Regions:
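Glycan-recognition and catalytic cores of secretory/periplasmic carbohydrate-active enzymes
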Residues: 1-335
Length: 335
């Protein structure tokens, strides 16, 4: 059906409408960047405040592609804010990205992210408070357990902000982020997961393609270096790095997503050794995961411990299907 122009236009409208509402809605952290795991209401305004690495990497890539097509400044800002959050809050000293941030801090869900009106009054000027009252629901009732989770209201999502309004929003973001960084942060799961880092490396490479921000490229390369140094041993990948040790045999997603990330990085700067590594990873993936009798790829390697069933993932769920990404990268490599 997508061969018909009107169907392509409809599909693109559905895509952009969804991503625009996500950008302004409560599922996106308006103050500090990064997307929460899911929403708890049908308007996508009040999230469960956990943030997952595997959500933000692919969303970063998706918004980068959307900006490349539309040149809409909103999407450029989402890309920048999400990448900044990844570098500020998720990148570990050794270079990899942490797996997730908890929803709770000090035992209270959302405490790090929500505001009392008196706190906002003390931090913002009159014009900024008026902006939040008009565009972010501050003039109404508190929307989360007696506090405000700030997001742009549904009516404003259909309109474009003026340059003056955008400047006001940016000032609000800077002031509230500075204040929020003084709070007790949510707990961080500091495991480095190969597959999740690979998704994020791809997203950061796509963001660099759009923004040409060298810090973003360096961040992606630091994560890749950790994987190469700590999780690639004796020609095989480990799935997890924690407390200085790589462990667990790599799964299909680790190989397929990492090859995909390498190919994305190679689009923005060329390194022959990384292409060679991608080919090497592809050879291991074929050797260790391919079902030579029935086709497709198993999630676990042939030398993995015996399981009652060896799954094959063909449908996208919380993350892309390993078989789909494996097929794509093998085609790109010419297999």
């Amino acid at each position: 059906e997508l061969q018909q122009p009107e169907h392509r236009q409809r599909a693109f409208f559905m895509l952009e409408n969804t991503l625009r509402h996500m950008a302004f809605g409560g599922i996106n952290d308006l103050i500090g960047g990064g997307f929460y795991r899911y929403s708890t209401d049908d308007q996508w305004m009040i999230p469960h405040f956990e943030k997952m690495l595997y959500d933000n990497g692919p969303l970063l890539a998706l918004y980068s592609d959307l900006y490349s097509y539309t040149k809409n400044a909103l999407y450029r800002r989402v890309i920048s804010e999400t990448a900044d959050w990844l570098m500020r809050d998720m990148q570990l000293p050794e270079g990899g990205y942490a797996a997730s941030l908890d929803a709770d801090s000090e035992g209270v869900e959302g405490l790090y992210y929500t505001w009392q009106k008196e706190q906002l009054d003390a931090l913002l000027d009159t014009d900024e408070m008026a902006f939040l009252s008009e565009h972010a629901g501050l003039g109404g009732q508190a929307n989360f357990e007696g506090q405000w989770h700030l997001h742009i209201n549904a009516m404003q999502q259909q309109q474009e902000f003026s340059q003056q309004q955008l400047a006001c929003l940016e000032s609000i973001q800077q002031k509230l982020l500075h204040a929020r960084l003084q709070r007790t942060p949510p707990g961080r799961d500091e495991k480095v997961l190969t597959a999740w880092n690979a998704l994020t490396i791809k997203g950061m490479a796509a963001a660099y393609r759009v923004l040409q921000n060298e810090d973003i490229l360096a961040s992606a390369e630091n994560s890749l270096a950790l994987i190469r140094d700590k999780l690639w041993q004796d020609g095989r990948l480990h799935a997890v790095y924690q407390l200085g040790v790589g462990r667990l045999n790599g799964y299909l997603d680790d190989y397929a997503f990492l090859i995909d990330a390498l190919l994305e990085l190679l689009q923005v700067r060329w390194r022959s050794e990384e292409l060679q590594w991608a080919v090497q990873l592809a050879e291991v993936m074929l050797e260790q995961f391919e079902d030579r009798d029935n086709g497709g790829f198993f999630f676990t390697s042939h030398d993995h411990e015996d399981l009652l069933q060896r799954p094959k993932a063909f449908s996208d769920e919380a993350m892309p299907a390993g078989n789909g990404i494996a097929t794509q990268v093998l085609l790109r490599l010419g297999y």
